[in-house]
Amino acid sequence: MRIGHGFDVHKFGGEGPVIIGGVSVPYEQGLIAHSDGDVALHALCDALLGAIAEGDIGRHFPDTDDKWKGADSRALLRDVYRRVKEKGFVLGNADVTIIAQAPKMAPHIQAMCNAIAEDLETELDNVNVKATTSERLGFTGRKEGIACEAVVLLVKAS
């Protein structure tokens, strides 16, 4: 068994929508990033890479490489999961926490779970996504950006 933890943050800027958890969420601003700025999938990639001792997303998909400019984070997640399987592991479960004052995530949570479960080749009940606010405190509370944490449990493939 292996456990991994990931964290990511992006600030708001430009035009919406926000891409998060593999889902397009309507909002007046987007997230500033080299790729599509999907903080949930970036945190999940970091958690998976950490669990297999393969560093972080920046090591594998550096923002200094134009190859990854505007990259679809679902494609990055699938590539990371391929690495997980090559190391002899599969997902036990994933738990993702989105921290945002806005936009409202609740209407999109199920679609996020569906996308993540598909990309990680797992059953829906192995994936949990939830959202919370920071009670109007800090940069997320001031609606300056979105943060996300993810935890994964990997088990040996049978």
Curated annotation (Swiss-Prot):
Pathway(s) where this gene product acts: Isoprenoid biosynthesis; isopentenyl diphosphate biosynthesis via DXP pathway; isopentenyl diphosphate from 1-deoxy-D-xylulose 5-phosphate: step 4/6
Annotated site residues (Transition state stabilizer) in this chain: 34, 133
The keyword Metal-binding belongs to this UniProt entry's keyword annotation: yes
Co-factor binding comment: Binds 1 divalent metal cation per subunit.
Zinc recorded as keyword: no
Domain of life, per lineage: Bacteria
Protein name: 2-C-methyl-D-erythritol 2,4-cyclodiphosphate synthase
Any coiled-coil regions, as ranges: none
Record's catalysed reaction(s): 4-CDP-2-C-methyl-D-erythritol 2-phosphate = 2-C-methyl-D-erythritol 2,4-cyclic diphosphate + CMP
Sequence similarity: Belongs to the IspF family.
Necessary cofactors: a divalent metal cation
UniProt keyword terms in alphabetical order: Isoprene biosynthesis, Lyase, Metal-binding
One GO term of the biological process aspect: terpenoid biosynthetic process
Binding, a divalent metal cation: 8, 10, 42
Subunit structure as annotated in this protein's UniProt entry: Homotrimer.
EC id: 4.6.1.12
Function statement: Involved in the biosynthesis of isopentenyl diphosphate (IPP) and dimethylallyl diphosphate (DMAPP), two major building blocks of isoprenoid compounds. Catalyzes the conversion of 4-diphosphocytidyl-2-C-methyl-D-erythritol 2-phosphate (CDP-ME2P) to 2-C-methyl-D-erythritol 2,4-cyclodiphosphate (ME-CPP) with a corresponding release of cytidine 5-monophosphate (CMP).
InterPro entries: MECDP_synthase, MECDP_synthase_CS, MECDP_synthase_sf
Disulfide bonds: none
Pfam families assigned: YgbB
UniProt binding sites for 4-CDP-2-C-methyl-D-erythritol 2-phosphate: 8-10, 34-35, 56-58, 61-65, 100-106, 132-135, 139, 142
GO molecular function terms listed in the Swiss-Prot or TrEMBL record: 2-C-methyl-D-erythritol 2,4-cyclodiphosphate synthase activity; metal ion binding
